[in-house]
Amino acid sequence: MKNKKWLISAVAGIVVALGIGTAFVSSYNSSEVKGNGELEELSPLQMKKFMKEDGTGFIMFSFNKENRDLYMNDVKRAMQQENVEGKELDGHHPKFDGSKSQNDYGLDQHADTLAVYKDGELKQQIELDEYDPSNLETELSHFIETSKEMYFEE
């Protein structure tokens, strides 16, 4: 009977150790930018604060009013597909000071782009208006996937 209890305890210990080890490895390799596809619209001051305090993630800077909704939908779908989230700054936000540029709010990217930042530094960006609307979501997914591999995964 003692051998049976010892065996059960040993097996339980191994299972627990494997579970902890797997959780550690999974968290070690997890991305800093994971999420569920949410694209959070920030005010200019919120963006400035985010870039100063964190500055890591996918950032969309919108300027073209007519294409903003189309671009946002494609970016959201690509983010959902790649399990990441991002932030958006609209150049026509009521609190966006027209005498200032996106640089004044912590962004170095061009207008109508999705960019990836790490610790406040622009790593790369994709120009949304350079792609045919029928291919944009695919291009965005590829951009996000390669950015995750290059900048956020060990």
Kindly give the residue locations of the regions a language model identified.
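A generic short-segment signal for beta-strand/edge and adjacent turn/coil regions
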Residues: 26-31, 80-86
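N-terminal leader/targeting and pre-domain segments
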Residues: 2-55, 136-139, 144-154
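Thioredoxin-like thiol-disulfide oxidoreductase module
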Residues: 73, 84-153
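Short, structured coil/loop segments at alpha-helix boundaries
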Residues: 3-4, 61, 65-69, 95-99
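Generic ordered-secondary-structure signal
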Residues: 24-26, 34, 64-65, 78, ...
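Short linear motifs at secondary-structure transitions and domain/linker junctions
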Residues: 32-37, 61-63, 87-93
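Local sequence-structure signature of Cys/Sec-based thiol-disulfide redox active-site neighborhoods
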Residues: 44-83
